[in-house]
Amino acid sequence: MTKDIIDIVNSFKHHQLQYGLGGDPEQEELYKWKLVTDQIGHPDVNAVDFAKEINSLSLKNLCYSTQTTAIRHFAEYEPEEYRKTFVGLFDENIGLQERIDKFISDCRELWDGKIKHNFTQKTSAMCDERLISFFLTLKDPTKYTFYKDEVYGSLCNLLGEKKKSAGQKLVHFYELLNNHVIPAVESDTELIDSINKEIDAKGYVHSTPLIAQTALWNYARYVRNNDKTQIWLFLGGKDADDYHFEEMYS
């Protein structure tokens, strides 16, 4: 692990010890643990009513509002075909990159072939790595966490890594997280103990990848607030509804 990563984790620890995950009004992160805990294991591919299963999901600001609309249209028009795409996505016997590629391809094909004609305006499947990371995190938060392009980009910059092209970023992000950030988090027992005490009091799920992602998001916010030349495509907190779709294709 690099000194920069250790410094980021240490900085996040100091913030955690001062505010906790839910005590800073400018950076409230506890909601992510609640959201995962409330919805872990969903969408359930064995649910009798898969449309209802999809419609019950709460994505909050972890995905784009248009993606919430899109997945509900999938559920409305082709729930059984949509179910099949998740069966493949959640098959851990298949490599993650292959699952991502197929999920994106199948969703686009399903949308273009059977759903798009229901709308007069131009639409798309709105299926990208950010949405996929949401589904994977709910499936297994001990292995996966949420993806944001700016967090991935800042991590690549720190490690001197070249960013992958769209469609290959999520796997690369998880690799960097597992190789560099998670070990730094796991070695900081003071940080782990503080977070575990807070989430245990609420009965929330444990997730080291989510801690690592939150530490990186803490750093990304710092960079955003201190580098006026940096253009951020998603603004969290009070600006959580300010979306820019170039992030999805960069």
Each language-model region and where it sits:
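An N-terminal alpha-helical hairpin/helix-loop-helix interaction module that forms a charged
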Residues: 1-125, 140-231
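Short hydrophobic alpha-helical segments that form membrane-spanning helices or hydrophobic packing faces
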Residues: 131-137
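Short, solvent-exposed loop/turn segments at secondary-structure junctions
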Residues: 137-143, 239-241
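Compositionally biased, charged N-terminal/linker segments
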Residues: 222-250
